[in-house]
């Protein structure tokens, strides 16, 4: 049996260890919510509709989430595991849904917990409360949240794809094609372009191994 290891930088003269940990936490946070599609449509809409920079949106959201016990626990534990890795060379993290957690996939731990614990409603309810500060028109907000909740693919629903989403606004074109926001009925087709019969552990491990193909987010096409 031969152990493998890697060398990692844990601090520099300009980035002390604690600041490095802060950077690791912010990277984990952005990966969990924005990269994985949990808050992506919300941040993009606020940027386009209100002119609020992504950095402002995510700094404000980070502070808001410090009020939630589940999120704070996740954040504290991730920080401790990063600290273990940096100071002891091993994370010593329990498996999540049967998936081993190492230094290189620790950043995915919370999105895995969201799926394992089915925290979808908890997280999206938090995001909806946060979004209230931007005072979007009520009908736009309702449409946006419906879209966001379905944009993240929940494992329990993979066999329901493709699914149809009827909205009152052309939100997808507004965010991705520079179209004017129009109040008119639209119908989207949401697809999970993967093996719909995959096991739950396979689904979870693909958040790392299929990260370059946007795994975990629905593909969107306009029907009408």
Where are these regions (language model features)?
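A structural motif corresponding to the C-terminal lobe/cap of the Radical SAM core domain
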Residues: 1-56, 60-61, 162-224
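Terminal or standalone catalytic/regulatory effector modules within metabolic enzymes
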Residues: 48-201
């Amino acid at each position: 049996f031969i152990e493998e290891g890697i060398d990692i930088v844990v601090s520099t003269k300009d980035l002390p260890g604690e600041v490095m940990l802060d950077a690791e936490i912010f990277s984990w946070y952005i990966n969990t919510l924005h990269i994985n599609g949990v808050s992506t449509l919300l941040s993009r809409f606020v940027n386009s509709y209100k002119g609020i920079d992504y950095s402002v949106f995510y700094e404000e959201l980070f502070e808001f989430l410090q009020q939630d016990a589940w999120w704070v626990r996740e954040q504290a534990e991730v920080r401790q595991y990063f600290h273990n890795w940096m100071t002891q060379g091993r994370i010593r993290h329990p498996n999540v849904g049967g998936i081993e957690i190492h230094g290189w996939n620790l950043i995915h731990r919370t999105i895995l917990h969201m799926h394992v614990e089915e925290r979808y409603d908890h997280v999206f309810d938090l995001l909806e409360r946060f979004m209230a500060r931007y005072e979007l028109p009520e009908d736009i907000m309702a449409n946006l949240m419906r879209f966001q909740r379905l944009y993240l693919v929940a494992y329990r629903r993979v066999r329901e794809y493709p699914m149809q989403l009827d909205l009152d606004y052309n939100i997808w074109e507004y965010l991705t094609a520079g179209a004017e926001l129009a109040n008119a009925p639209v119908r989207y087709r949401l697809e999970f372009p993967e093996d719909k019969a995959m096991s739950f552990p396979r689904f979870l491990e693909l958040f790392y191994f299929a990260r370059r193909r946007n795994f975990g987010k629905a593909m969107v096409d306009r029907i009408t």
